Every structure is written in structure tokens, then in C-alpha cells.
């Protein structure tokens, strides 16, 4: 007999795979002058406060657009150097959402923080748009480390990394081999390869071959100039339609809360929730758990106690056998997406990050 849990997971998987379009309908671009869409976001740069500096650089010849967050006491003329942290955004997200929120909060703690749009996404370059290869996302994180290392005010011996959702999985993967990362943390980690391969909650393992066949067909279409997309946000939906779709799903679940966050409360035109179907060919060969033992840096994994994605954090954490300093920190009452924006949960995560980076950077 199929369990209710797996039936729900299969329904969620059908939702994720059922929408093939590049974007949802946004009323208008973000009104914040920096495009930021989170609560308490910087609206102007002022002396004596955290400042934001949009920057561009290249990774493997492709333009990367990023926001650099500078602490309130930042002074290029002083002799002081600063610890720094890279922040990798979730799958389908952008630097102006939760990644920007946590980067700003880290800057408030005295870190130089950087959040970039993954290549092929957001304001970064790369064609076709919304290609989602794990190798690209991992290199984007090392690329942020590269950029920070060029800044004279950054202490290169004190660079850490934070990854959120899918960015958390890719940050763990980057830290496995990039030892310039001295302390690594994840928030609501999402193992992208495992989910694309096995289905959410491992509920559709038998469907893996069909997904790979669909990816192969999409690659053939790309050769003819047609790009095929997957995504969890119904294309061109009104707010009312998005709310109706949410009502079909249980509360405090990843995809229900994801529709609310990305489609309604924190939507941004660069955060479409979509990726090229052809990307499955690379995604399904990836699993962050494969080499977790290579992480020898201090490791902090944060997740919501009620998150339906918690199993991914727990399984990866259990395989991190190469570090003597690791901690799994669960936020009581929090689901996956709620760690992105609910003040109570964000504050708990930030306080834990303050303790962690304060000790190891």
C-alpha cells in the first residue's frame, strides 16, 4: 500500500514537473532602488550603516552580477581587514531575495558578504537562460571566493560560505574541494540531484528513467532552437490563481510555501522558479552526499524542525565524517521556506551563524 506521505510527495512532484515556462506574471519590477524584496532591505547607502555595492566580474568567461554588502564601519582608507562570507541563493531564486537578506544580516555583524546571481540566471550572463547545471552553481561559489580574494580589505584567511536551499547543497559541494572556504554553513539545504533523480521525499524513484528520457528529448529540441523549461510556478498566473493553487496543498510544505514566497510575497522578475528541462541530464548525476567526507572545515547545517526537506539535511550531515567540528541546528517550529523570511526564524538562524562564524573565521 502506498503511504499518504508518498502519495502527497508524488502529487508535489507532478506539480513541480507540470509547469513548463520561463516566468510567472509579476505586477512590476521591485520598487527598491537595488531591486531588493526582503523586509528591512537597504534603500540607500549611508555613512555609518551597512552599504550595498552592485558589482560585476567573470567566471569562466561569463558575466556574474552580484551585490557586495559592506559593514557599517567599512573604510577603505583604514588598515582594518574583514572576514567575508559568500551567500548562494536557492534554486529558482535571485540575489535580491533570501540570499540578500542573509548577506545584509551578516554585514550587520561585521562581515563583508556577497550574494550573486547564478550564471545563466538573474542578471548574470550565460545562454540558454535558466540552465541549471550543478557544476556551474558550484563554480559560482568558488567564483565568489575568487572575487572576495581580490579585495584588499578582505582577510583571505577568513572566508566562509553560506548556502540556502539548493545553494546550500552546492555550497557543501564547493567546500568539499575548495579549501579557501574556512567555515561552511547551509540553511534549509536541498539536495537538487537527489530530488530530480528520486522525486521529492524519494517518492518517485521509478520515474527517474522517464525524466532522463524527457531531458534527452529536450536536448534534441535545443539543437533545433527550442528551449524547454520546467518549474513549480504556474506560468502567467494571477495572484488569485496562485492562491487557489496554494489551497490545493498542505500548509507548511515546500511547494505551497514556495508558491507563496516566489509568486506572491517576495516575487522578483528574475526569480522564475524555472530551469531548462535539459538540465536534468546533469542534475540527476549529482548528489551532494557522495563526497561529504571531504569536508574537513567546521560545518553548520541549519534547518526548520518542521521542514519536509529536513531528511536531506540529516542525511548529508550524517555523512560529514571528515570534520571534527560539525553541528546540526534545528529551528523549532520552522518549515523550509519560513526560514527565508519569518523574523523569529531568521533571527534564530542569524544568531547561530553569528556564533559559528565568530568562532571559526
Segments predicted by a language model, with ranges:
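Short beta-strand element of the alpha/beta-hydrolase
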Residues: 79-90
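Catalytic histidine-centered segment of alpha/beta-hydrolase-like enzymes
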Residues: 334-346
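Alpha/beta-hydrolase-fold enzymes
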Residues: 172-259
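N-terminal cap/lid segment of alpha/beta-hydrolase-fold proteins
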Residues: 30-80
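Conserved alpha/beta-hydrolase
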Residues: 105-125
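The serine-hydrolase catalytic nucleophile loop
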Residues: 92-104, 118, 313
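Alpha/beta-hydrolase active-site loop
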Residues: 131-152
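Short beta-strand/loop motif that positions the catalytic acidic residue
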Residues: 295, 301-303
